[in-house]
Amino acid sequence: MGTQYFGIQQQLNDGIRGLHLNITQGATASDVSLCYPDCNAYNGGSLRDTLTIVKNWLDTNQRDVVTIFLESALLKASPAAVLKAFADSGADKYVLMGKPAAAWPSLESMIGNHTTLVVFSDDAGLVAANPKGYFIPHPNTVLRLDGPFTYGAEWTCGPWNRRYESILVIPHYIVQTATYNGATYNNMPYPFNLGTTNGYQFEFHAITCRGGQSIWINFMEVDYYSEGDVKTPTLKLNALPYPNDNVANFYPQFFDATVEVVG
């Protein structure tokens, strides 16, 4: 069962800039599949095909930055197969090479250098096996807060002590135990009550957890982003205007907004 109702192309067109991809060994040693939690429950196709979509999208959207979080399954894909998927898709030409030793580059410099694809991996073996250094180690860089949650549970914001992480990720989605194709799985998507989960609770969770951390929010992880309204609070968190908004709407209304002609 997928965690979104739309494919990668539509997600990017809709403004999604962070992609969480669960990778596992494919049918052959040179293949990498996107499955969650395994390919019996859900098979989302090949990593190469998804990376090709991302690469083609970046070709025509050169002022956008996309981030991919690679999460390895129990049956880990071989590092050589993952590298091959990046090379065969052409996505490797956009990848930011490794975590900067000091500060992260500005978005403007990344755009200018055409390094607009950032890739994190939780697999130390994959990070070590990559001679080009474009898989950034997830545990050393990303502070991922508590989650996921079950329905009715309180949103929490630990851990509270940042060590050296510079990227803040807040998981905001609900999971359940469910049976697919005769097998029972934990931490499966919960596609219910999304108007609430992806509505006011999204903004409440973000603001509450931001107040207890020393770094700004970089990513909110959500399932079924197209349900509810995560766009409006995301614009607010980024201090961006709403669609079709106008700066004149923020002027103080001391007088009627009319102009009289004097002859």
Predicted regions and their residues:
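Catalytic cores of phosphodiester-bond hydrolases, prominently lipid phosphodiesterases
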Residues: 1-262
